[in-house]
């Protein structure tokens, strides 16, 4: 199986682990630097979940190729006005979204020295926090959450921060906060879950975490964003280093029902099944047939970031002989993002993937980056469709409609990659209820059990307990959670979060026996 060379992989993975450095002399697209003029092209509408004008994308030959469809300049670029998606009030749906039906107590295990996660050492400006937080090798409960019932936990494969939504729909956050991604109005690290005051008047139904940014969705379908906005990943129409308080994104279309965040980009889906993306276009992960790359002055490479949500207008399939055909009438039902790739599940149970192709994470049996959503062939057969999708840092998962779990990409990037979807034999016959991926570890709630695996080094996110093996290449039951029913699992870069059901007295007793974690604070 071909494997991405280390040198090539360096293009994607941060060289210093701090999430900004990249190989080569490239500069990340910032507000500085003159944007070069691009020739206008005719546009025609095609694909997508509903009508509405949108850039037609040229599909002569392979998509991408650095081409981009012409469009009006976005705010902050050449002084043009941002093109904000707007739906007239009388045709706008009125929705009241429901949050998850789960109820339980939050458990955490893994790395909790938030500023050290994914880095060799704590940065100088965070030096005071150097010795705060430890690796929790088994499940713990937070002392400060006694009596708080949780319905959703959220983190991300690139994230060193976490969120929880209470049964009342209130959003709490904690962890790394260098860019204000916790939404508390400052950039101070927070050791244990704390209510986001700026959203206390809203009922939050779901949320998503990028590397240093956060999106929150209200019950009426509005989206609030906070954290890093250097690449426009907050969708506020500008590029700024940090936005520490929740701000509503520049979008006035149909209500949003689903969201996902990659490392430095975001995806939102409306109630009609249209998909919109914004942020860093570097590997084509926004799906607009371009990687947004251009040469600025002094031969510097910069990126033309999308600063407001823009519709993903075209979906394609490639035939065996290399022909590219548009796939019309795609109605999106779910979306998931890895560090630099995106997966979509549509109403016909088909899966599309695009963005960074390294390690085979797109499932197209090749490592090419894809600039527009491309059909993953395996799930395009009657009875073979997908029912759930999940994206890891460098891998992808799907659960088929008959319940089989499929995997492609790589969790351990120093070993063989899986270039197309393959059944996960270890979990054959298990009913997958919830799955989450960290940087290289996986955790699954299946039937009555919790299962995890991941290569070394790990930091406790597998939950096997003290004095037990720290890593496992094969799926293993998490024995420390025996008798505890996991309603939902979530994973950050190297920590795990579980909602433990606490309906019966026996369940409450089991949870009570777990150690309490009361982190030291400054």
From Swiss-Prot:
A GO CC annotation given for this chain: mitotic spindle midzone
GO biological process entries: cell division; chromosome passenger complex localization to kinetochore; establishment of protein localization; focal adhesion assembly; integrin-mediated signaling pathway; negative regulation of focal adhesion assembly; negative regulation of GTPase activity; negative regulation of substrate adhesion-dependent cell spreading
Record field: compositional bias (Basic residues): 24-36
Keywords recorded for this protein, A-Z: Acetylation, Cell cycle, Cell division, Cell membrane, Centromere, Chromosome, Cytoplasm, Cytoskeleton, Guanine-nucleotide releasing factor, Membrane, Microtubule, Mitosis, Nucleus, Phosphoprotein, Repeat
Compartment(s) where it occurs, according to its Swiss-Prot or TrEMBL record: Nucleus, Nucleolus; Nucleus; Cytoplasm, Cytoskeleton; Chromosome, Centromere
Region (Required for interaction with RAC1) residue spans: 318-325
Compositionally biased region (Low complexity): 71-82
Modified residues (Phosphoserine): 16, 43-46, 50-51
Topology in membrane: Peripheral membrane protein
Induction or repression: Induced by TP53/p53 in response to oxidative stress and DNA damage.
PANTHER family given in the database record: PROTEIN RCC2
Function statement: Multifunctional protein that may affect its functions by regulating the activity of small GTPases, such as RAC1 and RALA. Required for normal progress through the cell cycle, both during interphase and during mitosis. Required for the presence of normal levels of MAD2L1, AURKB and BIRC5 on inner centromeres during mitosis, and for normal attachment of kinetochores to mitotic spindles. Required for normal organization of the microtubule cytoskeleton in interphase cells. Functions as guanine nucleotide exchange factor (GEF) for RALA.
Complexes and interactors: Interacts with RAC1. Interacts with nucleotide-free and with GDP and GTP-bound forms of RAC1, with a slight preference for GDP-bound RAC1. Binds preferentially to the nucleotide-free form of RAC1. Interacts with CORO1C. Interacts with microtubules.
Protein known as: Protein RCC2
Organism: Homo sapiens
